């Protein structure tokens, strides 16, 4: 057992809780399904990763930890859509500064994460298309990020 995670089903402010047995041991949910020759999507939540092709989850906001397992040039970081969350904003800014490919969610997406998008009627194919169109790197990522963040 590496970790376990629970999700609130109601309107709780605390939506997820993750308990890791060894906090220094970075494991990825879904690593056994990854094709390293293809683009690898890295999400925060295991549930989110199940709706994307070739995706893993970190079970926290440290998505860059996936680069310990995969070629950085193959990775796309898919953070939750939380422009007011200081931790997420800080992690995203660091990822941009370190030249990762990163998804900057468009304004039309009001949902917090991929799971919420599915619950609100988006198909996995629609989500994959949005992610493909709104993946940026370097200066373009920085420009999109400045417009996206709210802190």
Predicted regions and their residues:
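Replication-associated primase and helicase/ATPase modules
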Residues: 42, 70, 74-79, 89-151
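Phosphate-handling DNA/RNA-contact segment within nucleic-acid enzymes
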Residues: 1-74, 87-89
């Amino acid at each position: 057992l590496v970790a376990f995670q629970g999700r609130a089903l109601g309107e709780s402010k605390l939506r997820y809780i993750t308990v890791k047995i060894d906090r220094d041991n970075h494991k990825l949910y879904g690593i056994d399904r990854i094709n390293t020759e293809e683009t690898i999507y890295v999400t925060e939540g295991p549930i989110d990763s199940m709706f994307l092709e070739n995706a893993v989850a970190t079970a926290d906001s440290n998505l860059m930890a996936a680069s310990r397992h995969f070629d950085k040039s193959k990775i796309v970081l898919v953070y939750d859509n939380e422009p007011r969350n200081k931790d997420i904003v800080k992690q995203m800014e660091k990822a941009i500064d370190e030249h990762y490919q990163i998804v900057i969610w468009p304004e039309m997406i009001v949902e917090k994460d991929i799971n919420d998008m599915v619950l609100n009627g988006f198909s996995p194919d629609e989500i994959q298309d949005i992610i493909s169109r709104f993946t940026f790197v370097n200066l373009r990522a920085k420009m999109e990020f400045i417009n996206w963040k709210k802190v």
